[in-house]
Amino acid sequence: MRKLRQTGTTIAGGQTLFQSPEEGWQLYTSAQAPDGKCVCTAVIPAQSTCARDGRSRELRQLMEKVQNVSQSMEVLELRTFRDLQYVRSMETLMRSLDARLRAADGSVSAKSFQELKDRMTELLPLSSVLEQYKADTRTIVRLREEVRNLSGNLAAIQEEMGAYGYEDLQQRVMALEARLHACAQKLGCGKLTGVSNPITIRAMGSRFGSWMTDTMAPSADSRVWYMDGYYKGRRVLEFRTLGDFIKGQNFIQHLLPQPWAGTGHVVYNGSLFYNKYQSNVVVKYHFRSRSVLVQRSLPGAGYNNTFPYSWGGFSDMDFMVDESGLWAVYTTNQNAGNIVVSRLDPHTLEVVRSWDTGYPKRSAGEAFMICGVLYVTNSHLAGAKVYFAYFTNTSSYEYTDVPFHNQYSHISMLDYNPRERALYTWNNGHQVLYNVTLFHVISTAGDP
C-alpha cells in the first residue's frame, strides 16, 4: 500500500484529491500548518484572474455598455416596427385613394377633384420618405443582430480570460471550501510534532482556573465556559460566543449543586465533567437541564492533593476528550503514584479500560490526549516542552522533545480540543490557545 507522509506544510508525496480539467484546478492533500490550520495544495490555472484584473474590469465595462446598447436598440426596434406598420397602412390607403380618384374622375366636380388632387400631390413626397424609413428599419434590425453577436463573442472572451462575476466567483470559493473540508476530513489523526506560539485570548480571573468549548458541538455552536479557581467553586459562566467571552458580555451563570476540585474539567456533548471536591467522584452536569445526570466514584483514584500535578491545586483528577472519546487521567496507590489513563463511558461514567503509563504524576506539569495518545509536559518549568508520550493503542511509550512557549510562567490547565485541533490553557490568569501540528500517514484511496 502506497502511503504519503506529511508534516507541517511539507509534502513528501502527492495525492490528487480533486481535479477539474475544464477549469485547470488540481487539489492535493497536505498536513496542518504551524498555525494549526489544515493546508491543501491547490494548483490553479496558468491564466490567473489576478494578473488580468485591469483588462477584466475593462471587459466587464464594455459588456455592460454593449448590453445597454442592445437593450436600447430592442426598444427602438419595437417602436419602429409599430410606426412602420402604421406608415405602411397609410401608404396602402394613399394608393387606394389615388386609384379611386382616377376612377371617379368624371363623377365629381372639377373644383372638388382639383382639391383632392392637390392634397394627393402634397402627400406624394412621403413615398420616398417611407422607402428611406423602411431601409432604416432594415439597418436597425441588422445592427441589432450584430450587437447580439458581439455580446456573445465578449461573453466567450470573458469566460476564456477568467473574468468571472461575483456570483460565479462566490460559487467557486464555496466549491473550494468544500474540497478543503474533505481534505481536512481525510487527514484525521496524527502524531504531535509541533506546538505554535501562544495566542492570548483574554486576561481574566485568578491565577488558577479553566475555560473550554464543547468538543462535540456543531461548528455553529461557539459557546465558551469559564470556571475561575481550583477548589470549592460552583459558579460556571457560559458565554454565547468566543467574541462575547473576549468582551465579557452575553453570558449566563450555572450554579453547580456540588463544588469542584482542580482545573481538569471538560465539556463534552452538552455536559460538564468534573471532580467533586474532597472526593474521587466524577460528576456529569447537563447544562440545558441544569441538573446532574450521573455521578460515580473512580475506583482507587487519589484526591484532595494526594496525587496532583507538580503545581498542586487539587489536580488529582484530569478529564480529557479527544477524537475517540472521554478519558480520565489520575493516580492510585496501587499504581504507586504513576499516571493511570482510563477510557470512560460518557453515559454511565464506568471505566471501559485502563492503562498504567509508568510515569510519576507528581513529575508532570500537565497532560493532554490526542488520538488516543497521552502527552505529558513539564509546563511547570521555564523551558516548557512535551517530553513524554504514552500510546494506548500499543500500550507503549516514548520520550519526545516538542518545545512550546510558557509565556506567563504558570500553566494550571492544559487541554486539547479535537474539534478545533488546539490546546486550551489557563496561564497565570490568562486564557491562551496553542495550535498544534500533527504528523499524518495517509493511505491513498484505491490502494490495497
Curated annotation (Swiss-Prot):
The gene is Olfm2. This is Noelin-2. Glycans are attached at residues 68, 149, 269, 304, 393, 435. Residues 188-440 form the Olfactomedin-like domain. The keyword Disulfide bond applies. PROSITE patterns: OLF (PS51132). Keywords: Coiled coil, Cytoplasm, Disulfide bond, Glycoprotein, Membrane, Nucleus, Secreted, Signal, Synapse. One of its GO terms (cellular component) is nucleus. InterPro entries: Noelin_dom, Olfac-like_dom, Olfactomedin-like_domain. Residues 52-79, 130-187 form a coiled coil. Involved in transforming growth factor beta (TGF-beta)-induced smooth muscle differentiation. TGF-beta induces expression and nuclear translocation of OLFM2 where it binds to SRF, causing its dissociation from the transcriptional repressor HEY2/HERP1 and facilitating binding of SRF to target genes. Plays a role in AMPAR complex organization. Is a regulator of vascular smooth-muscle cell (SMC) phenotypic switching, that acts by promoting RUNX2 and inhibiting MYOCD binding to SRF. It is found in: Secreted; Synapse; Membrane; Nucleus. Peripherally associated with AMPAR complex. AMPAR complex consists of an inner core made of 4 pore-forming GluA/GRIA proteins (GRIA1, GRIA2, GRIA3 and GRIA4) and 4 major auxiliary subunits arranged in a twofold symmetry. One of the two pairs of distinct binding sites is occupied either by CNIH2, CNIH3 or CACNG2, CACNG3. The other harbors CACNG2, CACNG3, CACNG4, CACNG8 or GSG1L. This inner core of AMPAR complex is complemented by outer core constituents binding directly to the GluA/GRIA proteins at sites distinct from the interaction sites of the inner core constituents. GO terms for biological process: locomotory behavior; neurotransmitter receptor localization to postsynaptic specialization membrane; positive regulation of smooth muscle cell differentiation; protein secretion; regulation of vascular associated smooth muscle cell dedifferentiation; visual perception. The keyword Signal applies.
